[in-house]
């Protein structure tokens, strides 16, 4: 992408990266931010590490841009000077982008190569020792739940709670609830294992949680930065309604050994899927040979979703959707600009993505 930028920025094409909700929290050691300031710190750090020349924009914590542009985690858009989207892809493709720009703006020869750009790899943030505490092995797919965080005393969220539910709990109210405490590398802190492990307390009405009091493992190493993970059983929950009140207590120590302080965090967790919560790659189930199951081809999956989206919005089944009634990417598929999106236009729009 940086190579394409160098070729087409002089031609007046403006490029932007947009930071959105993390699709896979934990990748490269990055923990999902809890506020906008933390997102901006991620942007600053990533830009410095990569040596990027392309400017960055940052979505707000309500993820309005992500929602408006179709929710794809790695999407790509070309917008003309009048504000019209002339090309879009649910998955960024630099080679196809270069072809589009060659057609729209003109071909550039010779092309800048990746080697000429000399980008630095995005290494994980430096932390205290990891690999000390074994990770929790989960069976089946887990889904992130909606979490609202509160912290007593105004301290940063040195550790961040992630809560996930299995399919049975999310749909039927009975199942397993995963809780993970992840130290945020932004704050350069570690667990002080000499003063005791983190503690978690779960309070909920008319729902049974076993156990409802949790304590992290005893660790011989004096410090580490591994996640603290727990799995509890839930019975008689109400999907979409049950609220878990969760209190977390731990001692945070900075890596420079300038402070150690007790921290209390409070969370409200709703038994409902967080559409912006992403998925942890380390939590995805693996096949017996240790590999993750193959997923459907991205293009096939996109066309399946596209057909479903059009069918859902075409309520009278006449093959036409009024543009003002369209949502998400359908808003941009009115190729002849007559105020309507036909099934044929939608197919052509998706073919170009």
Please give the residue ranges for each predicted region.
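Structural recognition of the beta-strand scaffold that forms the well-ordered cores
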Residues: 14-19, 55-58, 88, 322
């Amino acid at each position: 992408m940086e190579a394409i930028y160098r070729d087409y920025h002089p031609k007046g094409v403006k490029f932007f990266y947009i930071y959105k909700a993390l699709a896979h929290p934990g990748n490269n050691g990055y923990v999902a931010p809890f506020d906008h300031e933390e997102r901006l710190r991620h942007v600053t750090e990533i830009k410095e590490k990569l040596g990027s020349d392309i400017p960055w924009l940052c979505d707000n914590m309500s993820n309005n841009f992500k929602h408006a542009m179709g929710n794809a985690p790695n999407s790509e858009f070309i917008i003309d000077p009048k504000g019209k989207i002339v090309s879009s892809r649910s998955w960024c493709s630099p080679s196809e982008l270069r072809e589009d720009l060659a057609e729209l703006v003109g071909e550039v020869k010779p092309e800048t190569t990746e080697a000429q750009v000399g980008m630095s790899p995005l290494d994980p943030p430096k932390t205290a020792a990891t690999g000390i505490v074994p990770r929790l092995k989960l069976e089946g797919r887990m889904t992130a739940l909606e979490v609202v965080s509160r912290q007593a005393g105004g301290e940063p969220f040195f550790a961040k709670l992630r809560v996930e539910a299995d399919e049975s709990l999310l749909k039927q109210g009975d199942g397993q609830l995963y809780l993970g405490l992840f130290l945020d590398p932004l704050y350069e802190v570690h667990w002080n294992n000499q003063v005791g492990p983190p503690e978690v307390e779960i309070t909920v009405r008319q729902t049974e949680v076993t156990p409802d009091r949790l304590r992290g493992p005893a660790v011989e190493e004096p410090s580490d930065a591994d996640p603290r993970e727990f799995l509890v059983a839930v019975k008689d929950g109400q999907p979409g309604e049950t609220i878990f009140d969760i209190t977390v207590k731990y001692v945070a120590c900075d890596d420079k050994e300038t402070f150690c302080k007790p921290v209390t965090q409070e969370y409200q967790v709703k038994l409902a899927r967080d559409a912006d919560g992403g998925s942890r790659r380390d939590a995805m189930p693996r096949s017996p040979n240790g590999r993750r199951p193959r997923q459907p081809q991205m293009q096939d999956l996109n066309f399946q979703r596209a057909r479903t989206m059009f069918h859902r919005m075409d309520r009278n089944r006449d093959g036409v959707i009024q543009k003002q009634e369209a949502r998400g990417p359908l808003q941009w598929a009115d190729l002849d600009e007559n105020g309507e999106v036909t099934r044929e236009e939608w197919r052509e729009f998706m073919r170009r993505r």
